[in-house]
A protein has these predicted regions:
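Membrane-embedded alpha-helical bundles of multi-pass transporters/translocases
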Residues: 1-206
Length: 206
């Protein structure tokens, strides 16, 4: 349940909780998640795969300058990709859903709710991709336990917030909970790296 695994687990949990909501809630989450996962699948996974070998090499060579540079440039790239994607999905959620899905049994009301869910999911998109980078920073140091423990905290956060928010926000509350839990995950990953002096922002990133 590390990296993309915890994201998928949170979606599964959200879907289970949504089963107690009115008919259609699960579909709204499903279609919104499909679109939200697209930038993550294209850029996040590729970034993590490319980052790990080069970062591992720099760490084994005790090259702190190169290590910091790789980590900072990776975060820069993740933000450069994810922020425009998140803004685009947030602003254009409704027309995107309308064009792609509104036909047959998927009516205007479904478009409205799915778009709302997507816009809230999008708030967590930068965090999802940053998580890919930060988890790779742990893996490159052969530390798999810390990201695992942090992912457990993220899942618990998601469950608690989802249960608190579904009463007033329906499936949108589940999307908000998922986004917040992703940022909690990313923040904790960064804090543990910083505390251990494994992460230091340079002037370019700041």
């Amino acid at each position: 349940v590390v990296g993309s695994g915890v994201i998928q687990l949170n979606i599964v949990i959200g879907t289970i909780i949504a089963s107690f909501l009115p008919v259609g809630a699960i579909s709204h989450i499903y279609y919104a998640d499909r679109l939200n996962q697209l930038p993550l699948a294209i850029f996040g996974i590729a970034l993590g795969i490319v980052l790990l070998p080069s970062l591992s090499k720099a760490i084994k060579q005790s090259d702190q300058e190169t290590t910091n540079n790789i980590q900072n440039r990776s975060i820069e790239f993740s933000l450069l990709i994810s922020l425009p994607s998140a803004i685009g999905l947030f602003i254009l959620a409704e027309p995107i859903i309308h064009i792609l899905f509104e036909r047959g049994a998927f009516v205007a009301e479904d478009t409205f709710y799915t778009a709302k869910v997507l816009s809230y999911f999008a708030l967590g998109l930068p965090a999802y991709i940053i998580i890919k980078v930060l988890v790779s920073c742990f893996f490159a140091r052969e530390d798999t336990k810390t990201p695992l423990y942090i992912s457990i905290v993220s899942v618990i956060t998601n469950v608690v917030l989802s249960l608190l928010l579904i009463g007033s926000m329906r499936e949108m509350g589940i999307a908000v909970a998922t986004a917040i839990s992703a940022w909690v995950n990313a923040l904790l990953l960064y804090l543990f790296l910083a505390i251990r002096n494994h992460m230091k922002f340079d002037d370019l990133l700041v």
